[in-house]
Curated annotation (Swiss-Prot):
Catalyzes the NAD-dependent reduction of succinylglutamate semialdehyde into succinylglutamate. Pathway: Amino-acid degradation; L-arginine degradation via AST pathway; L-glutamate and succinate from L-arginine: step 4/5. This is N-succinylglutamate 5-semialdehyde dehydrogenase. InterPro entries: Ald_DH/histidinol_DH (IPR016161), Ald_DH_C (IPR016163), Ald_DH_CS_CYS (IPR016160), Ald_DH_CS_GLU (IPR029510), Ald_DH_N (IPR016162), Aldehyde_DH_dom (IPR015590), SuccinylGlu_semiald_DH_AstD (IPR017649). It comes from Escherichia fergusonii (strain ATCC 35469 / DSM 13698 / CCUG 18766 / IAM 14443 / JCM 21226 / LMG 7866 / NBRC 102419 / NCTC 12128 / CDC 0568-73). The lineage of its organism: Bacteria, Pseudomonadati, Pseudomonadota, Gammaproteobacteria, Enterobacterales. It catalyses: N-succinyl-L-glutamate 5-semialdehyde + NAD(+) + H2O = N-succinyl-L-glutamate + NADH + 2 H(+). NAD(+) binds at G220, S221, A222, N223, T224, G225. Its EC number is 1.2.1.71. It comes from the Bacteria. Belongs to the aldehyde dehydrogenase family. AstD subfamily. One of its GO terms (molecular function) is succinylglutamate-semialdehyde dehydrogenase activity.
Length: 492
């Protein structure tokens, strides 16, 4: 029984689904998808639970959410292993994900009060108040690259605000989704407040098509995000938060310490086997000897990166991709770039047949026309050369996406120019593109999102503002508007 609906574990009535470790092939999880009827049951359960949950004091909701944080802490080792085994990422990285989940609780509580708390302004004849109210029933679609942390970034603020939730994990990480749901169960959430439905495209379509849904919070690919946007078009009453991918540029300007800049580039492009939405996909290098030296050093260090299994010792920097199919898609993308005229500096290689262990790839595309503006979700970095910094900024902005952008430079004036001209939601200076703070908003523009950033701003899309003018008593104004006469009626 792998679905959690209205406080009970039930068996899915849809297709059978299995999940294996993408490196070893070990069977990890199996269960059945939720069918459309069960998705409807989950929605009805969430709707029935909403009034009571929303009427609880914030403190009462906070207690349950903080109890979940405690359970994450006490089950950190077990959850780390589940996430690592299912995604293929190394143990060390899965541990940082669980830590981020724990830290998200306190951050979300603070964000609720700062972004969506209550305010009161005294007026001569009363007061003006601002409060925030939950939307109702929200669907959360989780991704596979951070199957615990990223859904958590929607679910926690949604519950704190008083919403009830239907959570659909990625079909590639059902085990992690179930493991997190079991901790929420132990935290003592009332029945129906949080429901879990497993499944792929059919389950997702049934969930997003529900008429009685008040909103949908999504993290994933631009293609799926656009499909959801079209499906919910013409329904302005539903909140839709889309956190999508990017074709992110990293500009290398002047480099005093080449190894430090190479380290930053590797952290930007190849961490999580290139499976972060903020990963650098395009490296913009100065033409000339300095750019040549940097690229040579980047290739030399990158070719030493050997992917390994989640529990290998010593721990590898990167593990496998989410699936063998995903690894083959990256190789195919590299081959297509070569066919267009790209010059391979480092060829991506599948280490073993039947696994997702893929080494990083680097290919120079300077002077190649018609390169697709797409996100290749894996360890593949494309390189372009530029002559002037203005040209570098134009190249950085030459994308339909707008998630992250970075600059390596000793000159603050260039960073300030980039801040003014870059079209991206995250713009970093001498920091990896993959570095983000939960105390700041996280999201992009263009094809990277719909102006509903998450992290610190997640509270914004989990509640709507209610403004009030208030007075303890009602009296006739001493000064009336022209044309109003409240004198005693004169006998005719």
């Amino acid at each position: 029984m792998t679905l959690w609906i209205n406080g009970d574990w039930v068996t899915g009535q849809g297709a059978l689904r299995v999940k294996c470790n993408p490196v070893s092939g070990e069977l990890l999880w199996q269960g059945n998808d939720a069918d459309a009827a069960q998705v409807g049951q989950a929605c009805r359960a969430a709707r029935a639970a909403f009034p009571r949950w929303a009427r609880l004091s914030f403190g009462d909701r906070q207690v349950r959410v903080e109890r979940f944080a405690g359970l994450l802490e006490s089950n950190k080792v077990e959850l780390t292993a589940i996430i690592a085994r299912e995604t293929g990422k190394p143990r060390w990285e899965a541990a940082t994900e669980v830590t981020a989940m724990i830290n998200k609780i306190a951050i979300s509580i603070k964000a609720y009060h700062v972004r969506t708390g209550e305010q009161r302004s005294e007026m001569p004849d009363g007061a003006a108040s601002l409060r925030h109210r939950p939307h109702g029933v929200l669907a959360v679609f989780g991704p596979y690259n951070f199957p615990g942390h990223l859904p958590n970034g929607h679910i926690v603020p949604a519950l704190l605000a008083g919403n009830t939730v239907i959570f659909k994990p990625s079909e590639l990480t059902p085990w992690s989704g179930e493991a997190v749901m079991r901790l929420w169960q132990q935290a003592g959430l009332p029945s129906g407040v949080l429901n879990l439905v497993q499944g792929g495209r059919e389950t997702g379509q049934a969930l997003s098509a529900l008429e009685d849904l008040d909103g949908l919070l999504f993290t994933g690919s631009a293609n799926t995000g656009y499909q959801l946007h079209r499906q919910l078009s013409g329904q302005p009453e539903k909140i839709l938060a889309l956190e999508m991918g990017g074709n992110n540029p990293l500009i290398i300007d002047d480099v005093a310490d080449i190894d430090a800049a190479v380290h930053l580039t590797i952290q930007s492009a190849f961490v999580t086997a290139g499976q972060r939405c903020t990963c650098a996909r395009r490296l913009l290098l100065k033409s000339g000897a300095q750019g040549d030296a940097f690229l040579a050093r980047l290739v030399a260090v990158s070719q030493r990166l050997t992917p390994g299994n989640w529990d290998d010792e010593p721990q590898p920097f990167i593990g496998g991709l989410i699936s063998e199919q995903a690894a083959h898609q990256v190789v195919t993308a590299w081959q297509e770039l070569e066919a267009m005229g790209g010059r391979t500096q480092l060829a991506p290689r599948l280490l073993r047949a039947g696994t997702s262990l893929l080494t990083p790839g680097i290919v120079e595309m300077t002077g190649v026309a018609g390169v697709p503006d797409e996100e290749v979700f894996g360890p593949l970095l494309r390189v372009w050369r530029y002559d002037t910094f203005d040209e570098a900024i134009r190249m950085a902005n030459n994308t339909r996406f707008g998630l992250s952008c970075g600059l390596v430079s000793s000159r603050r004036d260039k960073f300030e120019q980039l801040l003014l001209e870059a079209r991206a939601g995250i713009v970093n200076w001498n920091k990896p593109l993959t570095g983000a703070a939960s105390t700041a908003p996280f999201g992009g523009v263009g094809a990277s999102g719909n102006h509903r950033p998450s992290a610190w701003y997640a509270a914004d899309y989990c509640a709507w503002p209610m403004a009030s003018l208030e007075s303890d008593s009602l009296t006739l104004p001493t000064t009336l508007n022209p044309g109003l006469d409240f004198s005693e009626e004169v006998e005719r």
